[in-house]
């Protein structure tokens, strides 16, 4: 049997491999240790931040739930603002807001409440809800613009910018006489047509109109009674482009006259019957 070859090794030389110190090895060790320390601090900071955020959310949720189940969250008072001509109590009933309702729930249902009130009251364009204090609910009503008034029996009603009529009946002294009065309109279609044309007039001209009469000979005819006592007769298709000549035409008039703008433009004095019919006598 062949003998194995044995190689002799110096023990000191073998041990020196483990004890030998290479230059720069300590610096790398310290650098690695420093990085580990910084990483631990960063992780600890991130963990504390996340825990703080979770605790804050939990505290807010607890506070909200505590408020929500308490009587402080119940509607105590509803104040109706911006609708002086409408009955505030009736509006609250239509909105179906009760003292037992939660303020938060009412605010969340604002769009639904606004639609209910607009459907019931033509004057209402929209409603905005807000809270004053802890549980006082403010209902801010945004009303539609009033373009004029129409005679309804012995009283008057508002004509809104969209052509709808207001719900409340007004006495002669209660409406704004700076806005025109629409008389003798038996058909809603004719009223809306003339209102649309009137709203398209220049602002300076609209301020001069006292009354619009629906007592016309033709569907395409439009009659305007002016505040200065003159009467304009025009065609619904062309009158918008012709009213700009009114101020220059009236300067040549010596008496209250009819200014016919249906075909061209000519003038004649008002008859006694016409003055009486238009309330100018």
Curated annotation (Swiss-Prot):
It is a single-pass type II membrane protein. The keyword Lipoprotein does not apply. Residues 1-46 are cytoplasmic. Keywords: Cell cycle, Cell division, Cell membrane, Membrane, Transmembrane, Transmembrane helix. GO terms for biological process: FtsZ-dependent cytokinesis. GO terms for cellular component: cell division site; plasma membrane. PROSITE patterns: POTRA. Its main location: membrane. Residues 8-31 have a biased composition (Basic and acidic residues). The chain crosses the membrane at residues 47-69. Residues 70-281 are extracellular. It comes from the Bacteria. Residues 1-36 are annotated as: Disordered. It is found in: Cell membrane. Residues 73-144 form the POTRA domain. HAMAP family: DivIB. Belongs to the FtsQ/DivIB family. DivIB subfamily. Cell division protein that may be involved in stabilizing or promoting the assembly of the division complex. This is Cell division protein DivIB. It comes from Lactobacillus delbrueckii subsp. bulgaricus (strain ATCC 11842 / DSM 20081 / BCRC 10696 / JCM 1002 / NBRC 13953 / NCIMB 11778 / NCTC 12712 / WDCM 00102 / Lb 14). The gene is divIB.
